[in-house]
Amino acid sequence: MLHLLVGLGNPGKEYELTRHNVGFMIIDAIMHHFLFPDFKKKHNALISSGSIQSYKVILAKPYTFMNNSGAPISSIVKLYKIPLDNIIVFHDETDIDFCTIRIKKGGGNAGHNGLKSIDTLLGRDYWRIRFGIGHPSNGYDLSYHVLSQFNNLNAVNNTISNIIEHISLLFENDKSIFKNKVKDLIKYTDISS
Protein backbone atom coordinates (compact mmCIF):
# COMPACT_ATOMS: atom_id res chain seq x y z
CA MET A 1 0.00 0.00 0.00
CA LEU A 2 1.31 3.42 -0.98
CA HIS A 3 1.70 6.21 1.60
CA LEU A 4 1.98 9.95 0.94
CA LEU A 5 4.02 12.15 3.28
CA VAL A 6 3.46 15.85 2.65
CA GLY A 7 5.41 18.74 4.11
CA LEU A 8 3.82 22.17 4.00
CA GLY A 9 5.88 25.28 3.36
CA ASN A 10 6.65 28.06 0.92
CA PRO A 11 9.05 27.70 -2.03
CA GLY A 12 12.09 29.95 -2.28
CA LYS A 13 15.41 30.42 -0.48
CA GLU A 14 14.08 33.27 1.65
CA TYR A 15 11.65 30.85 3.37
CA GLU A 16 13.98 27.85 3.80
CA LEU A 17 14.55 27.85 7.56
CA THR A 18 11.45 29.72 8.64
CA ARG A 19 8.98 28.36 11.16
CA HIS A 20 6.27 28.09 8.49
CA ASN A 21 8.55 25.76 6.49
CA VAL A 22 9.12 23.14 9.16
CA GLY A 23 7.02 20.72 7.06
CA PHE A 24 9.49 21.09 4.18
CA MET A 25 12.38 20.62 6.62
CA ILE A 26 10.91 17.33 7.86
CA ILE A 27 10.36 15.99 4.33
CA ASP A 28 13.91 16.98 3.32
CA ALA A 29 15.31 15.18 6.38
CA ILE A 30 13.29 12.04 5.61
CA MET A 31 14.50 12.11 1.99
CA HIS A 32 18.16 12.31 3.04
CA HIS A 33 17.93 9.82 5.90
CA PHE A 34 16.22 7.10 3.85
CA LEU A 35 18.22 7.84 0.68
CA PHE A 36 15.27 8.73 -1.52
CA PRO A 37 16.19 9.98 -5.02
CA ASP A 38 16.38 13.73 -5.62
CA PHE A 39 13.09 15.58 -5.88
CA LYS A 40 11.51 16.03 -9.30
CA LYS A 41 8.92 18.68 -10.07
CA LYS A 42 5.57 17.09 -10.96
CA HIS A 43 1.98 18.15 -10.34
CA ASN A 44 3.23 21.55 -9.12
CA ALA A 45 5.10 19.84 -6.28
CA LEU A 46 8.55 18.46 -5.58
CA ILE A 47 8.15 14.68 -5.39
CA SER A 48 10.38 11.73 -4.54
CA SER A 49 9.39 8.06 -4.31
CA GLY A 50 11.11 5.37 -2.30
CA SER A 51 10.75 3.02 0.64
CA ILE A 52 10.86 3.27 4.39
CA GLN A 53 11.43 -0.26 5.60
CA SER A 54 8.89 -2.29 3.58
CA TYR A 55 6.52 0.64 2.99
CA LYS A 56 6.28 2.37 -0.39
CA VAL A 57 6.25 6.11 0.16
CA ILE A 58 5.87 9.28 -1.90
CA LEU A 59 7.35 12.43 -0.36
CA ALA A 60 5.81 15.70 -1.54
CA LYS A 61 6.43 19.40 -1.04
CA PRO A 62 3.79 21.54 -2.79
CA TYR A 63 5.60 24.07 -4.94
CA THR A 64 2.76 26.52 -4.72
CA PHE A 65 2.69 28.92 -1.84
CA MET A 66 1.20 27.68 1.43
CA ASN A 67 -2.33 28.96 0.72
CA ASN A 68 -2.59 26.82 -2.44
CA SER A 69 -1.15 23.54 -1.13
CA GLY A 70 -4.34 21.60 -1.79
CA ALA A 71 -4.21 21.57 -5.61
CA PRO A 72 -0.90 19.68 -6.01
CA ILE A 73 -1.73 17.29 -3.16
CA SER A 74 -5.16 16.55 -4.63
CA SER A 75 -3.56 15.88 -8.03
CA ILE A 76 -1.07 13.39 -6.52
CA VAL A 77 -3.76 11.64 -4.46
CA LYS A 78 -6.03 11.20 -7.48
CA LEU A 79 -3.26 10.03 -9.81
CA TYR A 80 -1.91 7.39 -7.41
CA LYS A 81 -5.32 6.57 -5.85
CA ILE A 82 -3.99 7.10 -2.33
CA PRO A 83 -6.61 6.59 0.39
CA LEU A 84 -6.97 9.53 2.79
CA ASP A 85 -5.95 7.27 5.68
CA ASN A 86 -2.53 6.90 4.01
CA ILE A 87 -1.87 10.65 3.78
CA ILE A 88 0.22 12.30 6.51
CA VAL A 89 0.72 16.07 6.39
CA PHE A 90 3.52 17.69 8.42
CA HIS A 91 2.91 21.35 9.29
CA ASP A 92 3.74 24.13 11.72
CA GLU A 93 1.38 24.88 14.59
CA THR A 94 1.39 28.10 16.64
CA ASP A 95 -1.09 26.86 19.24
CA ILE A 96 1.23 24.27 20.77
CA ASP A 97 4.58 24.64 22.52
CA PHE A 98 7.85 24.85 20.62
CA CYS A 99 9.04 21.44 19.34
CA THR A 100 5.97 19.64 20.69
CA ILE A 101 4.46 17.09 18.32
CA ARG A 102 0.76 16.32 18.05
CA ILE A 103 -0.85 13.82 15.71
CA LYS A 104 -4.48 13.61 14.78
CA LYS A 105 -6.78 12.55 12.01
CA GLY A 106 -9.29 15.04 10.70
CA GLY A 107 -10.54 17.97 12.71
CA GLY A 108 -10.29 21.68 12.11
CA ASN A 109 -7.45 23.60 10.55
CA ALA A 110 -6.96 26.18 13.35
CA GLY A 111 -6.68 28.91 10.74
CA HIS A 112 -3.77 27.21 8.95
CA ASN A 113 -4.18 28.22 5.30
CA GLY A 114 -2.25 25.23 3.93
CA LEU A 115 -4.59 22.81 5.71
CA LYS A 116 -7.61 24.90 4.66
CA SER A 117 -6.57 24.49 1.03
CA ILE A 118 -6.17 20.70 1.39
CA ASP A 119 -9.46 20.39 3.31
CA THR A 120 -11.31 22.21 0.52
CA LEU A 121 -10.16 19.71 -2.13
CA LEU A 122 -9.79 16.44 -0.19
CA GLY A 123 -11.93 16.80 2.91
CA ARG A 124 -10.50 16.52 6.42
CA ASP A 125 -10.11 12.78 6.89
CA TYR A 126 -6.31 12.61 6.56
CA TRP A 127 -3.55 12.53 9.20
CA ARG A 128 -1.77 15.66 10.42
CA ILE A 129 1.48 15.88 12.35
CA ARG A 130 1.49 19.26 14.04
CA PHE A 131 4.96 20.60 14.88
CA GLY A 132 4.79 23.24 17.61
CA ILE A 133 6.49 26.52 16.73
CA GLY A 134 5.09 28.37 19.74
CA HIS A 135 2.98 31.50 19.78
CA PRO A 136 4.59 34.89 19.12
CA SER A 137 5.52 36.99 22.12
CA ASN A 138 3.29 39.91 23.04
CA GLY A 139 3.41 42.60 20.42
CA TYR A 140 4.75 40.36 17.63
CA ASP A 141 2.67 39.87 14.54
CA LEU A 142 1.67 36.26 13.80
CA SER A 143 2.72 36.45 10.14
CA TYR A 144 6.10 37.87 11.18
CA HIS A 145 6.50 35.01 13.67
CA VAL A 146 5.74 32.20 11.21
CA LEU A 147 7.87 33.73 8.45
CA SER A 148 10.91 34.30 10.67
CA GLN A 149 13.66 31.78 11.38
CA PHE A 150 13.82 29.54 14.44
CA ASN A 151 15.81 30.84 17.42
CA ASN A 152 16.86 27.30 18.39
CA LEU A 153 17.48 25.33 15.19
CA ASN A 154 19.32 22.65 17.16
CA ALA A 155 16.13 21.77 19.08
CA VAL A 156 14.18 21.68 15.81
CA ASN A 157 16.72 19.30 14.25
CA ASN A 158 16.66 17.07 17.35
CA THR A 159 12.87 16.88 17.18
CA ILE A 160 12.97 16.07 13.46
CA SER A 161 15.52 13.31 14.21
CA ASN A 162 13.10 11.90 16.81
CA ILE A 163 10.33 11.87 14.21
CA ILE A 164 12.57 10.07 11.70
CA GLU A 165 13.69 7.50 14.26
CA HIS A 166 10.10 6.31 14.68
CA ILE A 167 8.56 7.23 11.35
CA SER A 168 7.75 3.66 10.31
CA LEU A 169 5.24 3.58 13.19
CA LEU A 170 3.16 6.10 11.24
CA PHE A 171 2.38 3.39 8.71
CA GLU A 172 0.90 1.11 11.37
CA ASN A 173 -2.77 1.13 12.32
CA ASP A 174 -2.15 2.45 15.85
CA LYS A 175 -0.46 5.82 15.38
CA SER A 176 -0.60 6.54 19.12
CA ILE A 177 2.55 4.42 19.50
CA PHE A 178 4.42 6.92 17.30
CA LYS A 179 3.01 9.81 19.32
CA ASN A 180 4.11 8.28 22.63
CA LYS A 181 7.60 7.36 21.40
CA VAL A 182 8.28 10.85 20.02
CA LYS A 183 6.77 12.52 23.10
CA ASP A 184 9.00 10.49 25.43
CA LEU A 185 12.12 11.38 23.43
CA ILE A 186 11.24 15.09 23.35
CA LYS A 187 10.73 15.12 27.11
CA TYR A 188 14.47 14.57 27.59
CA THR A 189 15.63 17.04 24.94
CA ASP A 190 16.52 20.69 25.59
CA ILE A 191 13.80 22.48 23.65
CA SER A 192 13.96 25.98 25.06
CA SER A 193 13.28 28.39 22.23
Curated annotation (Swiss-Prot):
Gene3D superfamilies: Peptidyl-tRNA hydrolase. The active site is at residue 20. The record marks 92 as: Stabilizes the basic form of H active site to accept a proton. It is an enzyme of class 3 (hydrolase). Its EC number is 3.1.1.29. It is found in: Cytoplasm. InterPro entries: Pept_tRNA_hydro (IPR001328), Pept_tRNA_hydro_CS (IPR018171), Pept_tRNA_hydro_sf (IPR036416). CDD domains: PTH. GO terms for biological process: protein quality control for misfolded or incompletely synthesized proteins; rescue of stalled ribosome. The record marks 10 as: Discriminates between blocked and unblocked aminoacyl-tRNA. TRNA binds at residues 15, 65, 67, 113. It holds the Pfam family Pept_tRNA_hydro. Keywords: Cytoplasm, Hydrolase, RNA-binding, tRNA-binding. One of its GO terms (molecular function) is tRNA binding. It catalyses: an N-acyl-L-alpha-aminoacyl-tRNA + H2O = an N-acyl-L-amino acid + a tRNA + H(+). Hydrolyzes ribosome-free peptidyl-tRNAs (with 1 or more amino acids incorporated), which drop off the ribosome during protein synthesis, or as a result of ribosome stalling. Belongs to the PTH family. Monomer. This is Peptidyl-tRNA hydrolase. It comes from Ehrlichia ruminantium (strain Gardel).
